[in-house]
Amino acid sequence: MTTKEFAKILQDNLTSEYGVDLSVASHQQIYRALALICRQMMSENHKKFQSKAIGTGSKQVYYLCMEFLMGRSLKMSLFNLGLNDAAQKALAEADISLDSIYEEEPDAGLGNGGLGRLAACYLDGMATTSICGTGYSILY
């Protein structure tokens, strides 16, 4: 995706969600618009992957853990979707630092221990190796 295409998608999200232009949007609004872009693209990718997995009869892993220490996800999501450079350049044109937008993201707070980080690594590993899997936990 080019910087221009990404800038248009970002502006469209800011307009539809908040009714603002990138030049006057708050960092929180930009963060949420970027997160929405990532969610939309990941949902499309997930839908395609699930369809392929079901079509080929792949088995699925269901991982149950008390906690998942995922940390912040926007930076990694943009990177994994191949959007990091486009996002950085689109924001730089508006004199906004992508790093300052990353700071808007709260920590998921889904645990605080080594097992939570290990569980997150298992999920990352499944995603990286294209293993169809889902992590389940409780909200406490």
Predicted regions and their residues:
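A conserved ligand/cofactor-binding region detector
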Residues: 1-140
